[in-house]
């Protein structure tokens, strides 16, 4: 038996909005420690990893490990029926083929039940190794979203470079080029406005902007985004989910075609 009660129901709605365009179908894994998801996008270029720890729920019951295959588009449609202030309860029976979403208004004068069929989804669980990153950038999430959106109007690839000068986002396209440089800034009134750069080694990597723009759909979840970069590894773009977990996106860097054509 699974029963999870989340007082901040709007959190779950925001989580779904941030992953449904990247991943169509995925397994939600429930264990005694939390509610998680790990899935690749359809082109196997990006990976999304979500964790909502059990202690973040008002009530959390998971008798045994359970994996629930869901179509994220359908799940999002159901969650859109919940008000932003509603309390959301997720229920499923062991071995059952449906999951129930219950939405309660804060005054408890309205309760809605939505039942959704589960799917059988074959998914490989990818081990994500803990790694040491050459450079880590923490910045306001709305600033990162704005940069990705602005650069998309010029080109389709962003080069992220971290040096002792700061972090530079650049692109080039048919109409010209764009460079945006952010310098470390920790002397701000609000901690969420700070730009913090931890650089062990300089890095410069290229990524597809359409994926970066997709990742920024998680902006409503967190005021801050953390971008971890290493020359040999996928970038990690992480947004915290309140005090209860995180959503992390992994994206492999683009290899420059010019390198392949050199003799």
Swiss-Prot record:
The gene is PCNA. One of its GO terms (biological process) is regulation of cell cycle. Belongs to the PCNA family. The keyword Nucleus applies. Keywords: DNA replication, DNA-binding, Nucleus. This is Proliferating cellular nuclear antigen 1. PROSITE patterns: PCNA_1, PCNA_2. Residues 61-80 bind DNA. One of its GO terms (cellular component) is nucleolus. Homo- and heterotrimer. Interacts with POLH, ATXR5 and ATXR6. This protein is an auxiliary protein of DNA polymerase delta and is involved in the control of eukaryotic DNA replication by increasing the polymerase's processibility during elongation of the leading strand. PANTHER family: PROLIFERATING CELL NUCLEAR ANTIGEN.
